């Protein structure tokens, strides 16, 4: 058949979860539609409502020291360690919502690095604070300095613009005025007209309030003895709140600039501000908790909260009136969003919990897997003690205020929950057949089983398994699907898996019986191991359970893989052959067709797949524990292997057995188990790929890497096959059409189609036929006026393509005359400006217009020189003939005399 094409396996990048924040400043616009974050030297703009990437602004080669957004979202200001300050104008595209950032200006803001920025509410003024203690105020639009303030010569740690409230003078106008009242009226008049102030906090604990109109310091507030990190002003309360690393929170009267309240927070405070029209004050710091205070009394309204881990400590915070949340930045680069409470809720206020988390970076992705029956969540082990659950559902994200509702659908890549319980880094995980149960193993020498009830927003630890002496490098749950009529099949949430297998760096494997009821929190006894076996001579890297739940395999750094009986814990076979440690092992799935080996088809117990540090993958026969085939192609260790799903076709002979592998070379490969060849190589990572998993229905491959990215690869094999068949069919139709035009003598249509199909041989044949026609048209340059018209109406792409062909033909003396004739036709058909201004995509290197014309000129000069030499030689022949004619009379006379 014409459309029968060889089957080709292809995968394309469908989604990528990338890091957006690696520490530093965070900024938001008033509508919470633009989130600006620091990613090393670059700035990232993201829509926090749907996680969409809006723009990436490349840096100047130095790390960013701080950045900010104007409240209106019109400008982005970036300061780097190179001492430069760049101001970008932001314009949102109406088509896809992305943002185009245009560099408005670059200036040297200070003689030392700028570490803090602030913008006023009108988005017109910018304040910059340097490490030398100086503060400058800039006009953002014009780009010049309006004010320069110098206080103490220590680092500026906080800046905040505010406007003092204009006080009413009505009472003062009634009756007799005292001198104090007159002074107050004069101050009120100034405040009503020139009310801009700038509060500046320094590393020495002092806070200065600068009057922008008078260009002087109106208050010097001394209460803190360490860095001032939080500054905010409330017009309703006429108060300024300051917070510092001296573990105190201070409220100041904005009229007299005297202290109203000082509260010890007993933690390093990194963020503070007013909420609910200043009636409440929030603070957050090293303990990682959001705390709410009554502004009037200074009393804490939130209940006492236990300090969180060091990684969950708060590094900075952000809130302004109108925002639907308080944004707190954690030390581990997570952005936690909290709902701001109201004072009316003070009596029932509980410990605040974030309603949404945005992971700035997932760090190294050590392991991952799909969760839930619909596989709408992915569990990530991310070089931390918590397991992150991320949404991968394709639901359309909502915009506006509804995006922050608790019942709004999570967008692709949104953090849904954290599984908190381990004390050390989680290094392995496994998921059962239903997707509701996940087992984790960590460096705290324990394994945990988690129950995932996403519908009810419940993610709880079901049981903890303690007994290993060292880190757990491998955990495995049974993958077999229970019988249709069983309770485990109909209600998997209330029927945990029957057992768990764990492997540790203590070189032992353990089988655990999973309790039918959840362990109580704080329960110390835990579950007991059914058996413990000394399994290997080195660390155990991976464990996998056979789909029948009768066998399990353990892979170790001792270069071997052992097959065990689940029931007795006895070794059934040992797989030897790898030259380095084995990182991954996977049994073949159920109902897999037979694999063709050297000794015929492999049936019976099936096969097992292993990936090793020796850069190879091996396929083993479980019947006799021999190697069927070795797969080579990775240039570094093979860290993970996983089987792809079988096609749905009923014909077993047509089912392709494929698997995927992830390597330390940063590549993901898809292999054909029967041919031993790599079907395709997937490249989207910059570091080693530790984890890979396959969607059980659509064959989507998800890979996690040390570069903090998670890539989702969509299987496009059927689309590629259909497109290739369609392209082949179209090519055949066009070739037949070309033959028909040539046969009919329709040179105009034939040349146009030959150019379109890029058939240089047929194009040359056509032009040769035109030039050698027996009845050329009078006045035609090429030989036929129809061809002249075709050559005179070509697009830029077609002209460039034809010039490429003329360049090639011109190098051969046999085809050069055709090239010269067509070149003449082109030159006479278009002005010189047409050739100099050709707009052609991809015309680079040897195919650039300059190089093409140069090659044509060089060979044309060579042909011209050869023609000149032929002309000169023709004169010599003519001269010789003339001389011979001059000798003819003498020869005739000699003949007569001889006669």
Where are these regions (language model features)?
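Intrinsically disordered, low-complexity acidic/Ser/Thr/Pro-rich linker and tail segments
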Residues: 1-55, 66, 75-87, 91-97, ...
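Loop/turn segments within WD40 beta-propeller blades
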Residues: 25-32, 67-73, 111, 116-124, ...
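Conserved strand-to-loop turn within each blade of WD40 beta-propeller repeats
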Residues: 38-40, 79-82, 128-132, 200-204, ...
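A structural motif specific to WD40 beta-propellers
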Residues: 52-55, 96, 102-105, 144-147, ...
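Blade-level signature of beta-propeller repeat domains, shared across WD40, Kelch, NHL, RCC1
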Residues: 690-721
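Extended acidic/polar alpha-helical scaffold segments
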Residues: 779-899
């Amino acid at each position: 058949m014409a459309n029968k094409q060889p089957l080709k396996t292809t995968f394309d990048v469908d989604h990528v979860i990338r890091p957006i924040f690696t520490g530093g400043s965070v900024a938001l616009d008033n509508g919470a539609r633009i989130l600006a974050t620091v990613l090393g030297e670059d700035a990232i703009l993201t829509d926090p409502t749907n996680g969409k990437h809006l723009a990436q602004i490349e840096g100047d080669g130095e790390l960013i020291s701080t950045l900010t957004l104007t409240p209106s979202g019109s400008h982005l200001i970036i300061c780097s360690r190179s001492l430069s300050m760049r101001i970008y104008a932001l314009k949102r595209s109406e088509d896809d919502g992305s943002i185009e950032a245009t560099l408005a200006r670059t200036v040297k803001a200070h003689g030392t690095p700028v570490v803090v920025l602030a913008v006023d509410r009108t988005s017109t003024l910018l304040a910059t604070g340097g490490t030398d203690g100086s503060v400058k105020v800039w006009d953002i639009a014009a780009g010049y300095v309006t004010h320069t303030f110098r206080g103490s010569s220590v680092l500026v740690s906080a800046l905040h613009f505010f406007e003092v409230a204009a006080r009413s003078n009505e009472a003062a106008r009634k009756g007799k005025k005292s001198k104090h009242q007159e002074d107050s009226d004069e101050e009120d008049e100034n405040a009503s007209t020139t009310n801009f102030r700038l509060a500046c906090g320094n590393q020495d604990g002092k806070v200065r309030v600068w009057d922008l109109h008078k260009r002087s310091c109106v208050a010097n507030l001394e209460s803190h003895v360490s860095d001032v990190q939080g500054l905010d002003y409330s017009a309703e309360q006429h108060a300024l709140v300051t917070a510092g690393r001296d573990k105190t929170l201070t409220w100041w009267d904005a009229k007299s600039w005297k202290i109203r309240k000082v509260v010890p927070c007993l933690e390093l405070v990194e963020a503070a501000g007013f909420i609910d029209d200043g009636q409440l004050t929030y603070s957050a710091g090293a303990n990682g908790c959001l705390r709410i205070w009554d502004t009037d009394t200074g009393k804490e309204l939130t209940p006492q909260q236990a300090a969180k881990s060091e990684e969950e400590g708060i590094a900075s915070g952000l809130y302004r009136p109108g925002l639907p949340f308080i944004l707190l930045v954690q030390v581990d680069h997570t952005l936690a969003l909290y709902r701001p409470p109201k004072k009316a809720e003070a009596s029932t206020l509980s410990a605040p919990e974030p309603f949404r988390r945005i992971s700035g970076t997932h760090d190294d992705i050590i392991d991952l897997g799909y969760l839930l029956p619909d596989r709408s969540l992915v569990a990530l082990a991310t070089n931390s003690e918590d397991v992150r659950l991320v949404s991968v559902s394709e639901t359309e994200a909502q915009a506006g205020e509804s995006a922050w509702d608790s019942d709004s659908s999570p967008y692709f890549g949104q953090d849904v929950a954290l599984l908190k319980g381990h004390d050390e880094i989680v290094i392995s995980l496994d998921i059962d057949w239903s997707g509701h149960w996940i087992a984790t193993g960590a460096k705290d020498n324990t394994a945990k089983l988690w129950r995932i009830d996403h519908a009810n927003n419940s993610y709880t630890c079901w049981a903890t398994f303690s007994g290993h002496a060292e880190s757990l490098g491998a955990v495995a749950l049974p993958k077999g699907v229970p019988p249709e009529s069983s309770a485990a099949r109909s209600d998997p949430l209330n029927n945990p898996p029957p057992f768990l297998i764990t492997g540790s760096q203590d070189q032992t494997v353990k089988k655990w019986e999973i309790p039918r009821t959840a362990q109580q929190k704080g329960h110390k006894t835990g579950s007991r191991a059914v058996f413990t076996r000394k399994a290997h001579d080195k660390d155990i890297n991976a464990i996998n359970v056979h789909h029948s739940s009768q066998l399990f395999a353990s892979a170790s750094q001792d270069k071997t893989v052992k097959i065990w009986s689940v029931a007795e814990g006895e070794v059934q076979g040992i797989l030897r052959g790898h030259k380095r440690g084995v990182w991954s092992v996977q049994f073949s799935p159920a109902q897999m067709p037979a694999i063709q080996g050297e000794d015929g088809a492999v049936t019976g117990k099936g096969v097992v797949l292993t990936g090793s540090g020796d850069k190879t993958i091996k396929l083993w026969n479980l019947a006799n524990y021999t190697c069927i085939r070795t797969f080579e192609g990775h240039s570094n260790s093979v860290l993970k292997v996983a089987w792809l799903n079988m096609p749905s076709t009923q014909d077993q002979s047509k089912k392709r057995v494929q698997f995927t592998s992830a390597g330390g070379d940063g590549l993901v490969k898809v292999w054909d188990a029967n041919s031993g060849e790599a079907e395709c190589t997937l490249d989207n990572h910059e570091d080693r790929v530790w984890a890979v998993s396959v969607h059980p229905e659509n064959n989507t491959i998800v890979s996690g890497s040390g570069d903090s990215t998670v890539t989702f690869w969509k299987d496009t094999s059927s689309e590629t096959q259909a497109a290739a068949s369609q392209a082949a069919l179209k090519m055949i139709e066009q070739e037949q059409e070309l033959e028909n035009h040539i046969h009919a003598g329709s040179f105009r249509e034939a040349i146009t189609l030959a150019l379109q199909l890029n058939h240089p041989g047929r194009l040359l044949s056509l032009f040769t036929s035109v030039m050698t026609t027996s009845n050329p048209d009078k006045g035609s340059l090429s030989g036929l006026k129809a061809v002249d018209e075709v050559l005179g109406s070509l697009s830029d792409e077609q002209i460039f393509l034809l010039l490429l062909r003329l360049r090639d033909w011109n190098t051969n003396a046999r085809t050069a005359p055709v090239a010269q004739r067509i070149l003449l036709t082109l030159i006479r058909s278009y002005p010189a400006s047409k050739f100099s201004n050709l707009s052609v995509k991809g015309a680079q290197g040897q195919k650039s217009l300059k190089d093409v014309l140069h090659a044509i000129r060089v060979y044309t000069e060579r042909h011209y020189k050869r023609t000149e030499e032929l002309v000169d030689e023709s004169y010599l022949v003519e001269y010789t003939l003339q001389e011979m004619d001059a000798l003819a009379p003498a020869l005739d006379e000699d003949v007569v005399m001889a006669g």
